[in-house]
Each structure stands twice: as structure tokens, then as C-alpha cells.
């Protein structure tokens, strides 16, 4: 199953060993970033580093080596631009980098196999999800220390905070519920059941009672009115009212939706449905499916720019393009042959996409207006994802 791939640590030529001591970012000595919005961050799993590429020049301005056998999964910059963080899936540690100096300033033990993460809006709290540990590690960014481990989850993936920072919502890929965390107490206070497994489960036990493809993320709408959580096994999107923390509507989408992605104008959202190779376009005003369109296999992400949606089909080598005004297909972009596309970020001007391509260790830059592609090679070994501060399309597998 492709979703198993999404949750599997990428293989590669990794050196055995423990995480190196502080100072492993020595190759970045003397490099300074005065404007945190000026760079694309690239997480390289097999070279165990975070690379920084200047958006204007497309030149590497620095790399921070994290240590041997780290296998970083996702990279994110704090909202205040002060720090860059990542979780080392094989190291069971969180790594904190000073943005201005590109120095690794702290390594903090987490629970098992840290992957996805998020910052509170005020940059105070760094929540690190640990899918194999069924927990969230809470890191205080003032003291740069782990202050708590929140237990009780089921393969937690993505974390989203309310704009006021009062609550965090945790997608549980191994269950059909979204966890609600009281950020003041750092406690799991509620489980929002997206839907019940239907009574026909006994008739199709492989689908309903086998490996669960649950909730990847509870994604807020741009206006913050609702949260949307796609359940892969059940093929639905649950609409959550955060004022009451309950599901107010179910939207039937395609088979095995991976997650939901929000358009920037607040009109539509998209679920890539890997079970039937379609996308569902959801009208956020009516909370209903406005269109179901053919797509590609093994979709890993959706980005929005220039009135279009760009849907990444990981193993086909294509990015599928859709006109978000007419809600119709607008072609596809061939990125290469026998390549593996990962995930992308969109620049803050919504002009270009920066797509990680792991086979040839490069970043592919897509011009959103013309669909032209530019390649930047030698970014690191097995680039897994990209991140730009303040982008509306920062996500991971």
C-alpha cells in the first residue's frame, strides 16, 4: 500500500552511529541569514542535513549536518524566524538550529520516531509528533528543553494550533479521531470521533478492520471557522466546529483520501484520493463536493498558485494541474522519468513551487504561471521536503 510507503522511513546509504555532539554544523560557520523569508529549507534524509537555498540566486547558502543515522523527516521555521527545527526519525531526537548563524544549538531527546511537528503561533511551544511512540513531545523554545510528553494518541501525524494558541489538534493516522490538546496544560482533553466504522465492517474486514488509514491532519479553513479532517479508511471528511469541538457535517469524497489541502482564497479545498486516483474539490461555503476529477497515482501533496492547483503524483513523475476557477483539469507537467517526487512548498508571492525530488537529489522549481520547470541539483541526499517561512503551502508527507 502506498500509504505504508508514506509512513516508512526512506532507505539509503546511512552510516551507523549516534547523534553527533553540538557543533556538528561547523560547515555552516560564518554563514548568516538576515532575512528568514529569503531561503528555502530542504530536509535531506540520507545526508542527514538541512540545506538552505537562497530564493533569488538559487544558490546554497549553507547546510547544517545533524549527525549520523538521524534521518530527518520534516523541517519548519518558528513563526518569529529565530529557529529552524526538525525531528530525527532514527535518532529519536529533536534538532534546533539558529536561523541567523546556521548553527545547531540544541539536541533534545523525544519519544520514538519523531516525524511531523508544529509551532504555537507565538513561537513558544514546539510540538513534536512521535507516531511510533503514540505521543507528542512538548518543547519549550525559551529554555530549549522538553518539558512534557503527552501520551494517549494513536500514530499521531500532523499538529495544528488555533490562531490564539489555546488548543492544538492532532491527527491520528492509526484511529478515526482527532485529539484536542489544552496548550495551557499540555494535556489531551478530548477525542473527536470523525465517524464510526460502519456495521458492514464484518462484510469487508480487510478494508475496515485491517490496517487503519485514519486522520493525517485536522486542517483549519483560511477563515478559521472550521477544521477539516479526512479519514482514509472511511472515505469521508469530517467538518469540526472548534468552538464546540464536535463534527457538524460529513462530506463523502473519493477512496482513501490522504489528507485535505486548503486553497488560499478560502473558496475550495482538495483531497487527493489515492484509492481511486481522483481528487475531490470541496466548496468551503457549502461544505460539499463541487467536483471530482481524475488524477494520478500515489499523490503526496497539493499546492496552490496563480489560480491553479498543482497535485503531486509521486511515482508517476507528473504534477497534475487544475484550474480553480473552472474546476477543470488544466494539463499535467512531466517532471521526469523514473523519478520519485516528494512534497513542495510555494513561495509567499505564489509564483513558484519548490518540489523535492529524491531520486536525483534535486529541487524542481515550477513557474506557476507558465508551468516551466527549473532544476537545482546536488541539494543533499534524498531530499524529502521543502519549507519557506510564511508560505501557505508548508506540509510534509
Language model region names:
Residues 7, 12-397:
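Predominantly soluble domains enriched in secretory-pathway, periplasmic, or organellar proteins
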Residues 1-5:
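N-terminal secretory signal peptides that target proteins for export/translocation
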Amino acid at each position: 500500500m502506498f500509504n505504508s510507503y508514506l509512513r516508512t522511513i526512506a532507505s539509503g546509504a546511512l552510516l551507523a552511529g549516534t547523534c553527533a555532539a553540538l557543533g556538528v554544523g561547523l560547515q555552516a560557520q560564518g554563514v548568516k541569514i538576515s532575512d528568514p523569508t529569503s531561503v528555502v529549507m530542504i530536509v535531506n534524509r540520507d545526508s542527514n542535513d538541512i540545506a538552505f537555498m537562497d530564493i533569488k540566486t538559487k544558490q546554497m547558502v549553507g547546510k547544517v549536518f545533524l549527525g549520523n543515522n538521524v534521518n530527518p523527516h520534516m523541517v519548519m521555521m518558528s513563526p518569529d524566524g529565530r529557529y529552524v527545527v526538525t525531528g530525527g526519525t532514527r535518532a529519536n531526537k529533536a534538532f534546533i538550529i539558529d536561523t541567523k548563524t546556521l548553527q545547531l544549538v540544541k539536541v533534545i531527546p523525544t519519544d520514538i520516531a519523531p516525524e511531523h511537528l508544529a509551532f504555537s503561533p507565538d513561537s513558544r511551544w514546539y510540538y513534536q509528533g512521535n507516531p511510533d511512540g503514540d505521543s507528542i513531545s512538548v518543547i519549550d523554545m525559551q529554555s530549549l528543553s522538553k518539558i512534557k510528553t503527552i501520551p494517549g494518541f494513536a500514530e499521531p501525524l500532523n499538529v495544528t494550533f488555533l490562531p490564539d494558541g489555546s488548543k492544538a489538534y492532532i491527527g491520528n493516522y492509526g484511529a478515526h479521531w482527532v485529539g484536542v490538546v489544552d496548550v495551557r496544560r499540555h494535556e489531551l482533553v478530548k477525542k473527536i470521533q470523525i465517524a464510526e466504522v460502519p456495521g458492514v465492517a464484518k462484510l469487508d474486514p480487510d478494508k475496515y478492520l485491517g490496517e487503519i488509514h485514519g486522520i493525517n491532519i485536522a486542517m483549519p479553513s483560511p477563515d478559521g471557522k472550521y477544521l477539516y479532517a479526512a479519514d482514509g479508511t472511511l472515505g469521508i471528511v469530517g467538518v469540526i466546529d472548534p468552538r464546540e469541538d464536535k463534527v457538524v457535517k460529513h462530506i463523502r469524497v473519493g477512496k482513501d483520501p490522504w489528507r485535505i489541502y486548503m486553497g488560499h482564497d478560502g473558496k475550495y479545498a482538495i483531497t487527493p484520493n489515492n484509492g481511486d486516483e481522483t481528487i475531490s474539490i470541496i466548496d468551503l461555503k457549502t461544505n460539499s463536493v463541487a467536483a471530482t476529477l481524475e488524477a494520478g497515482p500515489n499523490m503526496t501533496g497539493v499546492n496552490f498558485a496563480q489560480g491553479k492547483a498543482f497535485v503531486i503524483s509521486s511515482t508517476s513523475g507528473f504534477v497534475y494541474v487544475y484550474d480553480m476557477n473552472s474546476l477543470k483539469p488544466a494539463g499535467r507537467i512531466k517532471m521526469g522519468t523514473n523519478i520519485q517526487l516528494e512534497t513542495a512548498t510555494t513561495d509567499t508571492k505564489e509564483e513558484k513551487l519548490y518540489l523535492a525530488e529524491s531520486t536525483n537529489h534535486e529541487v524542481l522549481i515550477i513557474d506557476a504561471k507558465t508551468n516551466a520547470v527549473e532544476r537545482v541539483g546536488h541539494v543533499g541526499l534524498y531530499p524529502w521536503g521543502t519549507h519557506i517561512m510564511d508560505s501557505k503551502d508548508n506540509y510534509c508527507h
